[in-house]
Amino acid sequence: MELKSVDAALLQKAVLAAAKGLEAKKEWINELNVFPVPDGDTGTNMTMTIMAAAREVAAIENPTMESIAKALSSGSLRGARGNSGVILSQLFRGFTKEIKESNEITVTSLANAFTRATETAYKAVMKPKEGTILTVAKGMAEKAVDLATQTDDVIDFLTQVIEEGDY
């Protein structure tokens, strides 16, 4: 099955699925986190952040890109916990700035949104460190830009972008 674009209703479902997916990997992320500080709560903080956003996104009855973008950005910021949660909220903030005025999202707009998300998150961190969530986001954004000229299938595109972040 090919998917050429994502509308607001599908984006709403995707955000909710992503929140459940992150929650399922919370403990694994907690164990994975050892740099820059092995605090063991990165997965928990990111989960609390995305769940706050997901609650706001789920409450939207007739979704538009603008309403999803607003709920995702504001919900994640208000629910941000710890450094990783704040960075995640800034990734969402940048992503939503890029998509909020769209009727649908294509691989090109996703690549632009991932790039803007990464730029926004880097700017929000006073002293960004490589080897953190920022590095993963940057690698995924770069992969997205490369792929945007190679495929127009959103599923294929996202599968490859996610694989890039899973190194």
Annotated model-derived regions:
Residues 1-167:
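N-terminal loops that bind phosphate or other acidic moieties
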